[in-house]
């Protein structure tokens, strides 16, 4: 599951996770996409421009937190856990606006706050 591709296609990764369910998700990429608010409404998101022409593209891949905010990523990992996926998130860096090292550090910063690391509570105390 790669949310960055779902985003540029106009899909909602949170809803896709719920629709697929945990049985259909075997690996998850942690990569973001920023839809350009000036170019996308004019050109759509099926962009034909070279990836290096960022200023004219309708979207570009971004590091985690630079296309969508931290709340989105908290919702993303929570939905994965809700459907039963509790495994690897592979950070994939294709952000042309920052170095690989900086992109990795910034992605890790956001994901550390978004991911829950302890076992989930399986039964509510009132049940």
Give the positions of each predicted feature.
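A structural motif corresponding to the C-terminal end of an alpha-helix
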Residues: 75-86, 117-118
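Conserved, mostly hydrophobic/aromatic
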Residues: 2, 28, 80, 89, ...
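A short, acidic, flexible beta-alpha connecting loop/helix-capping segment that sits on the rim
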Residues: 90-100
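Acidic/histidine-rich catalytic cores of soluble enzymes
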Residues: 1-66, 122-126
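C-terminal helical cap(s) of enzyme catalytic domains, especially alpha/beta-barrels
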Residues: 100-120
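A conserved mid-domain beta-alpha-beta active-site/ligand-binding segment of alpha/beta enzyme cores
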Residues: 72
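A general structural motif
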Residues: 22-25, 82-88
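Short, flexible loop/turn segments with low-complexity composition
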Residues: 92-93, 119-127
């Amino acid at each position: 599951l790669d949310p960055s591709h779902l985003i540029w296609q106009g899909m909602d990764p949170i809803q896709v996770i719920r629709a697929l369910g945990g049985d259909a998700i075997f690996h998850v990429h942690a990569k973001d996409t920023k839809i350009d608010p000036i170019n996308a409404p004019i050109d759509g998101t099926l962009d034909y421009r070279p990836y290096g022409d960022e200023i004219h593209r309708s979207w570009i891949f971004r590091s985690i937190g630079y296309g969508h905010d931290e709340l989105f990523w908290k919702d993303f990992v929570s939905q994965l856990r809700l459907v039963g996926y509790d495994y690897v998130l592979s950070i994939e860096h294709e952000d042309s606006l920052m170095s690989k090292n900086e992109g990795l550090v910034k992605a890790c910063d956001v994901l550390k706050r978004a991911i829950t690391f302890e076992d989930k509570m399986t039964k509510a105390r009132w049940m």
